């Protein structure tokens, strides 16, 4: 929905001057105004920008708190003390937020989702491969049955590998981590 500055201020329950300040901080504008012409904002883009801004501010607060706790010297923190527990909680919150941001940005993908996608792709590939011998036979009627059998055998092997792809993801992840660590 496209709105002017006054309406956007009402949506966020802030003063229109706050919207102007946000513009200087990067609030996206659907069309910039000029003398006598109002600026127009896309509410979806504005809400997304605001949410990201708030997330960044919260992350910065958590990082600062974490740095303050580290400055207090991690070695001074004794398990069971309130400072130690606060440090653990803050660190866990910061890590969780960074992981959430990475997931939202598409940098991190859950293994279950990746496995599901890989299995779907493998099924589609297998479906195409199974039709290859019939396509060859129709396109080249003179092809010998022994040649078709060889093609069918190789396609069956490839289809079996594709079918097991979802089962192999865990092992492949371990292989990747070992290779990445070396």
Swiss-Prot record:
It holds the Pfam family Phage_Nu1. Signal peptide: none annotated. The keyword tRNA processing does not apply. GO terms for cellular component: host cell cytoplasm. GO terms for molecular function: ATP binding; DNA binding. InterPro entries: DNA-bd_dom_put_sf, Phage_lambda_Nu1_terminase-ssu, WH-like_DNA-bd_sf. It is found in: Host cytoplasm. Residues 51-105 form a coiled coil. The keyword Kinase does not apply. Keywords: ATP-binding, Coiled coil, DNA-binding, Host cytoplasm, Nucleotide-binding, Viral genome packaging, Viral release from host cell. ATP binds at residues 31-36. Component of the terminase that processes and encapsidates viral genomes during virion assembly. The terminase is composed of two small and one large subunits. To initiate packaging, it binds a specific sequence, at the junction of adjacent viral genomes in the concatemeric DNA substrate. Next, in a reaction stimulated by the presence of proheads and ATP but not requiring ATP hydrolysis, the terminase creates two nicks at a specific site, one on each stand. Terminase then separates the cohesive ends in a reaction requiring ATP hydrolysis. Belongs to the terminase small subunit family. Heterotrimer of two small and one large terminase subunits. The active complex may be composed of five heterotrimers. This is Terminase, small subunit. The lineage of its organism: Viruses, Duplodnaviria, Heunggongvirae, Uroviricota, Caudoviricetes. The gene is 1.
